[in-house]
């Protein structure tokens, strides 16, 4: 949204311009706290809806239950929406205790928003230019990288829909001016005055001091955040190219585990390696700061016959056969519980390890699915008895995958190893053992 004069007279036109990409959405949800920012946003939208063909408006108030005074806010918000003719919903959430009450409340709030967004819906929130400047300062003091210093994007994916912040180019002074001219009422959150919260200190003490010396400080800081956002976009585009150049095809692609060729990545500069790895791993795990990437270098530079891994918050990165593999935390745990297969005509659900089935005529006898314990031996037609470890080596099954690989037994006889050619069924091909591995959205303890 372009900036303008501080009186805010042109806010409706500027807002309509900022929302142009979202005019075809089915519903515009408005995050409505009852404070100044969201009150002005909702009023502007309701007024615009009288003369423009806009998506349906639906206000959502999230009650965090953190202070007694907030109990009156849902009713205030309901009355405001009733007067504006806007659909209203109040949602009470539970804020999980943690080191940061602000962060926990934000997570609970956005979880509630995400739950309500349908495909193509848009959530509109009222963050403004001063909020953007505050966010940049806060993250700068925490040592954030380019992505963090880009502060709040104007739009991003949120659940099945999108989040848009159409007021990021508007100052708080403009919002206050508009609210007074329109005679709007809003609630004041007393926690915003609590100096124990770092952002409140920046808002009430640091930014006013900066603007007293540099009147355009907030506009300059917000503009810098925009420049950094553009720089991050370029870094993302470069990383996407590097990921594409490192795509790997393995015999085990059906497992659905993220895999890249190490060679093309290792040939990049150190900074570019970290950029592509951040891009690839960001949807999969929380990442360390820039001072804690020694694990990546150790994995990258380990000897060819080593089994290096880089353990991260939500899983681990492994290396095998010239590739790097991402394993979620659940995959790190070997399975040990044997499962009896009473009716091999039906698929068998394995505890936290997907499902196996038999294609063709099932072998006779008492069947069960087990996992590697060591020293297993398998009889192969024309080859005699062979150590399972050697057979898995021949099939190039990475060692870190073997602990979850289903083995079919009849009594104590190893009959088959799921999905591995030559090991997955009977010599006469009357049956095959098939395994559908657990996917990322299945529960893995």
Swiss-Prot record:
The EC number(s) this enzyme carries: 6.3.4.19
Residue ranges the record marks as coiled coil: none
Cellular compartment(s): Cytoplasm
Binding site for ATP: 33-38
Keyword presence, tRNA processing: yes
GO biological process, one term: tRNA modification
Catalysis: reaction(s): cytidine(34) in tRNA(Ile2) + L-lysine + ATP = lysidine(34) in tRNA(Ile2) + AMP + diphosphate + H(+)
Pfam families for this protein: ATP_bind_3 (PF01171), TilS (PF09179), TilS_C (PF11734)
Listed PANTHER family: TRNA(ILE)-LYSIDINE SYNTHASE-RELATED (PTHR43033:SF1)
Protein function: Ligates lysine onto the cytidine present at position 34 of the AUA codon-specific tRNA(Ile) that contains the anticodon CAU, in an ATP-dependent manner. Cytidine is converted to lysidine, thus changing the amino acid specificity of the tRNA from methionine to isoleucine.
Domain notes: The N-terminal region contains the highly conserved SGGXDS motif, predicted to be a P-loop motif involved in ATP binding.
Protein name (Swiss-Prot/TrEMBL): tRNA(Ile)-lysidine synthase
Gene it is expressed from: tilS
